[in-house]
UniProtKB/Swiss-Prot annotation:
GN (gene name): rbfA
InterPro entries: KH_dom-like_a/b (IPR015946), RbfA (IPR000238), RbfA_dom_sf (IPR023799)
Family: Belongs to the RbfA family.
Main subcellular location of this protein, as a coarse class: cytoplasm
Upper classification of the organism: Bacteria, Pseudomonadati, Pseudomonadota, Betaproteobacteria, Burkholderiales
Record GO terms (molecular function): ribosomal small subunit binding
GO biological process, one term: maturation of SSU-rRNA
Name of the protein this chain belongs to: Ribosome-binding factor A
Source organism of this protein record: Herminiimonas arsenicoxydans
Subunit structure and binding partners: Monomer. Binds 30S ribosomal subunits, but not 50S ribosomal subunits or 70S ribosomes.
Amino acid sequence: MAKHSKSIPGRGLRVADQIQRDLSEIVAFELKDPRVGMITITEVQVTPDYAHAKVFFTMLSDNKDEIKNTVSGLSAASGYIRGQLGRRLSIHTLPELHFVHDTSTARGIEMSKLIDEANATRAKDAED
C-alpha cells in the first residue's frame, strides 16, 4: 500500500490506491506510446474533491531527456488513460492526472552509498 498524507480521509486513500493499481495495469498492458517505457507507478495523491491526482512514477533510466519524454508521453495519453480509468472506477468525478517523476528511489540509493562510504571510512580509521 502506498504512503499518503494524513489529511486525506479513508475513502480518498482507497480511491488513490485503486487508481494506482489501475494505472499500473493500463500503462503496462494498454498504453502503446513509444515514449513511455518500463515505468512503475509509486504513489497517487488525490485532492479531497477528486478533481486532481498527482501520479508519481519511477523508471530505470536517470537520463533527463528520457524522463522528459516519458512525462510528455504520459501527459499526451492522459485523455486515453482517464477514459480507461472511467471504465474501471465508479466515482462521480474522475481526476485530472498530473504525472511527476519520483526521485525518492534515486535519493535513497545515494543516501545508502553515502552511509556505506562513511562506514568504510570509519572501519579504515579504526584499523589504523
